[in-house]
Amino acid sequence: MKLLNNFPKKTKILITGGSGFIGGAVIRKLLKESDCIVFNLDKMGYASDLTSIENVLTNLNVEKDKRHKLLKTDLINYSETLSAVKYSDPDLIMHLAAESHVDRSIEGPGEFIKSNILGTFNLLEAAKIHYEKLSYERKKHFRLHHISTDEVFGTLGEDGKFNEESRYDPRSPYS
C-alpha cells in the first residue's frame, strides 16, 4: 500500500513535535516514501533534534526548505500556532507534540497541563479555523490525527495488553 495513497501529489502535512523521537521517525518515513511537503512545528525544547531529518534530506539530495520546513513554534502561544497553521495550509495535521516524562509531570504538573492540554486546544482551534476556509474538495480529504500514549490506560493488568476497548485509567498529569 502506497503511503498517503488517498491524498493528492505534494500533500502538505503539518506535524507537531516533529523534532522529537516519534515525530522525527514519522517525518523521516514521509520524506523517504512520499512526495509530501512536511511542516515541522516544534518549539525545539530539550528533547528536540533535527539531525536525523537533515541526514535523510542530504541522502535524498533534497534542498532542506523544499520538502521540510521547520516552524519554531510553541503551541501554548495561540497566535503563533494560528499563524503556523495558516502558513503551512495543511491537508493533514499529525499532532505528536507533548511533554512526555511521567516523573516530571508528577513533580511539576503545571507545565504538562499548559503544554499538553492548552497546546492541544490551541492547535484544535487553529485547525478548525483552517478547515472552515478549505474548499469542499480539500475538506473531504482533510484529517487531524492526535497521537497519544499508552499511559492513558494506566498500569498493565495481569493479561499485559491494552486494546481499543480498554478503559482510560490515567495515573499522572502526563497521561
Q: What is each of the regions a protein language model found here?
A:
Residues 1-175:
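N-terminal Rossmann-like NAD(P)+-binding domain of SDR-like oxidoreductases, especially those catalyzing
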